[in-house]
Amino acid sequence: MASSSSPPAAMEVGESTNWTELPPELTSAILHRLGAIEILENAQKVCRSWRRVCKDPSMWRKIDMHNLGDLDDMDYNLEIMCRHAVDRSQGGLVDIGIWYFGTVDLLNYIAHRSSNLRSLRLIRCSQITDDGFVEAVVKLPLEELELSYCSFSVESLRVVGQCCLNMKTLKLNKHPQKENDDDALAIAETMPKLRHLQLCGNGLSDTGLNAILDNCSNLEHLDLRRCFNVNLVGDLQKRCFESVKVVRHPNDSIHDIDIGSSEDEDPYDFSDIDLMSGDDDFEGYYDFSGASDFSDYDQFDF
């Protein structure tokens, strides 16, 4: 006898997805594709179920604070927002990326509350001083570090290498530099376990490159794009290709390096979803505007 149950009706052409009725696991998978700013400013305001997912500490093991650097035109305070995201992780934060707005106070806030942090990315964070950077980083068990278009000294880099003994990935990207092997020698002296090294725009010469190859025997990926003081030909080129699996040449394109430029649109568009209004579960939602202060932030009950 044929089953009396009928198959579910196929979605009609033009029928839109009801984003608010997705299972929590699928909602979480979707929201993990978004940055922290999009989650806190938009996604968590969609409905109660999305807000519950957004409050789960597992959503905040990785925090991406990517922005375009137009800080004066924003209606919210990114530092306050970042602190809130760190708090939501409840100590489980393992990976964080900060673009433009990083400060010494914020970095120390992260370090004090994230003893398991393994990956730190600072892009164009000009307000962080060498002393403040070192004070925070020496407390962390970092394995991955990116310092792109920042102004930290070689002494800070050396201290990081001496304190973070399991450093496996370093990205130290700059605008093209005059010949200078200080960074390369500090890396060679203090980071022997490196597997991935990106030095776009660095001033290292053949001398610095040879020092890295001598001391970082585990290197698998070496990115020398825009390192125009390296003469990667002949014996040096042969040595690189024999000891390192992937080598990017000084003249290779840098189009795939994320340095804070605009990205494509978010993978999921929430523009057609009404944000929560008059919802009892959403009363007291925290305001990330510049008018908010840290005392209000500390007292807010999430």
From Swiss-Prot:
Cellular location of this protein?
Nucleus
Could you tell me the Gene Ontology terms of the biological process aspect for this record? protein ubiquitination
Where does this chain mainly localize?
nucleus
Q: What is this protein called?
A: F-box protein SKIP19
F-box domain location is 16-63
Function, as annotated, reads: Component of SCF(ASK-cullin-F-box) E3 ubiquitin ligase complexes, which may mediate the ubiquitination and subsequent proteasomal degradation of target proteins.
Pfam families with a match to the protein in the record: F-box-like
